[in-house]
Amino acid sequence: MPSPTNPAKVETPFTTAALGNGVDFWKAYVENRPHPSDSFFELISEYHHSHGDSAAQSAIAHDVGTGPGNIAEKLLRHFDHVVGSDVNEQALAAAPALLPADSIKRMTFVKSSAEDLASANIPESVGKGQTDLILVSECIPLLDISKAFAAFRALLRPGGTLAIYFYSRPIFTGDNEAELNQLYDRIATRVCQFLLPFKGTPGFPIHYRAAEAMSSGLDSIPFDPEAWQDVVRYKWNADVPLTFNSKEGYDFEVEPVDRRDHSTEITKEITDRDFWAEEWDIGRVASFLDSVFPNYRNKAGDKFEEVQSLFTELETALGGPKATRKVSFPVVLLLATRK
């Protein structure tokens, strides 16, 4: 057993493996993750301006889990100033190298977990009670929801907006799409298995929480009606699970959970294979998986050849090393107004 002076290392999904990486890693991360469309952020802005009170609605936004600030920068089109927070100091340090200098002038970066934001060292003018919109980009499954939501309420002004979104695996379209999607799933599931064990480790509660949130399409995330109102849940391409790999990638069982308030919340499901559509070749698939599962190649060791063989199958099914195919994604967006 670990001693009190030498506690067990807690490995969490993505976060632990991403620590210590510099500008090159984060540049590749930005390039190889999906790129949310301008219309997606316009939808968030439209909700924001049509709910809550109208005072100072476009002054301050805060991007939680900002990484190197690429999504935070997109918010500058809609807000005067954007705060970006993250637990990863190296990710924050990469922002000036990856973003335009004129954007950096209108941004503030803060090292903090989401759960600790209420006590973080955020300048008063852009901190507690001053924030018009909080955007939680792709990190919500990792968070302690009750603690994080309490921190978000502390930052938001009354009538401010909380926007949470999450995307998962690529969905291949067109000819032989079933074959392509099955091959992707086999690859991603084997990659996830290289990271085992999860169960019985200090980080297991976070692994379980993340798996539950993803397998539930974020329906496991509740909004307290005493604290939030006008909750809307958008679900694009919900016919595909909001997970990066199948359940066989885990060493524990997880089932979907629905904690929605069906009497007050609105859920909108949209099937649209052109949503966030991009053209991907085999290299882009491999780079995407590198960004989702950092360091998996080292964890795989000699077994990496199993994945290489599957990549070869997928490359052939795509039509060759340079052949591309349109992909879309399952995406969930949660919107709520602070009471």
Curated annotation (Swiss-Prot):
Alphabetic keyword roster: Methyltransferase, S-adenosyl-L-methionine, Transferase
Coiled-coil regions listed: none
SUPFAM superfamilies hit by this protein: S-adenosyl-L-methionine-dependent methyltransferases
E.C. number(s) listed in UniProt: 2.1.1.-
Biochemical pathway: Secondary metabolite biosynthesis
One GO BP: methylation
Keyword Methyltransferase belongs to the record: yes
InterPro entries: Diverse_substrate_MTase, Methyltransf_12, SAM-dependent_MTases_sf
Pfam families recorded: Methyltransf_12 (PF08242)
Induction: The cluster is expressed in rice fermentation medium. Three regulators are located in the cluster (ptaR1, ptaR2 and ptaR3), suggesting that the production of pestheic acid is controlled by a complex regulatory mechanism.
Gene Ontology molecular function: methyltransferase activity
Family to which the UniProt record says this protein belongs: Belongs to the methyltransferase superfamily.
PANTHER family: METHYLTRANSF_11 DOMAIN-CONTAINING PROTEIN, METHYLTRANSFERASE TYPE 11 DOMAIN-CONTAINING PROTEIN
Protein's job: Methyltransferase; part of the gene cluster that mediates the biosynthesis of pestheic acid, a diphenyl ether which is a biosynthetic precursor of the unique chloropupukeananes. The biosynthesis initiates from condensation of acetate and malonate units catalyzed by the non-reducing PKS ptaA. As the ptaA protein is TE/CLC domain-deficient, hydrolysis and Claisen cyclization of the polyketide could be catalyzed by ptaB containing a beta-lactamase domain.
Annotated protein name in UniProt: Methyltransferase ptaI
